[in-house]
Amino acid sequence: MRSKLLNGITSVIIVLALLSFYGWSVRKHGIPGKAQGLWGKFLVTLTSFPDLVTQAAEEVEKLPGTFVPTHPAFEPVNRLDYDINVLVSYSNEEGNRAIEVRNLKTQAVKKSWEVKGGLKPHHRIMHPLLLSNDRIAYATNGYDGIYCMNAVGEQLWHQKEIGHHPSMNAGIGETMWVCAYDLSEASHPSNGVVYEMGGVKYHFLDNYIAQLDTETGAILFKRSMAELLLDHGLEHLIIKSVVVDDPIHLNDVEPVLESSEYMLAGDVFLSFRTSSVILHYRPSNDSIIRVIEGPFTSQHDVDIVDGQTIAFFNNNAPTKRFKEDGGRNKEPNLLKYPAYSSHIKYYDFASQTFSAPNREAYSQNGVYSFTEGLFELLPNGDVLIEEQNPSLLWVFRQDSLLFKGILPSHHEGYHHLLNWTRVVD
């Protein structure tokens, strides 16, 4: 009996000694980033295993980036007294991409298309364009070209020479304009432009505009934005951006459909996000008519209001994220700025002035999108806004809120990511 007791005590002492040695070894050699030798690396692997299992489980449970958590306090608003039909796209239960014409007032689906095959979980169909005879022009952010399908989902054409990101708009006649990447020599965009500063070379991504024939998909016009800036003495806009590898970030090409005193049919307005500038460009003679800069940053979605006015979604955000407190949280607050919010900015060519009507209403409702975002002026004067980052849709009548909504998804607690909602007839 005594012998068994001694053996038990001895075993406990040995186990405690081994645990003590193991704990000392982990503390001494097994800290990630400080591990030395084979023994240290072994300890890191051993002690990190539970974390790896947890991380793997979280990754399995994580939803693709095409879904957005719905805020627990979200309350929809629908005071619409008329129909608004919008073209939306989202990831459906089968993992394909649905494109729909949906009535915001009733949530009824009027028309639908489905894109199948070759899709990765994060792929988005951004800003699809409804053409005549219920044809749909579309592309994914997977850089595999631009497609067109008919009303029953049959592919009509596939333009492989350019990739699309992020907007496409109807042009004059059976044409369309797209923001594009050149894929004629590679299957993906590359940082193919370089400049030198202080003996250091910097490479960056070029952007293109392209005009397509909507009947065939043939490219009618294509222009490099990097070359355009260089050819017109505007290369300073490249180093104005804090995003060195993406200093242009073309996010909209808006065609002029009717001539006026300040613009000609066939002109286009180009929105460069990371340099916070809008160019008025005339492809017919390769001339830049205006460089528009002012009290706006990271803007998107230029729209033509009338013959002398344009408007655009002013994200009113820095072009690159920084520390939340700017790294100076220990300094006393001497001056506090009002909160920044996104809004719609108007530019009048006649007076060369900016305005932002109903800005307070947008601010009071918390409208803010660090990236992306768009708006559309409705025929009755109301305004539809896509607050893209949280993926909320808004309709305002001057300073009154008429609609606040989401695209509900099949995942509880999540709604669909918005992909540049378009108002259609």
Predicted regions and their residues:
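Positively charged n-region of N-terminal signal peptides that target proteins for export
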Residues: 1-4
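Histidine-/acidic-rich catalytic cores in large beta-rich domains
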Residues: 7-425
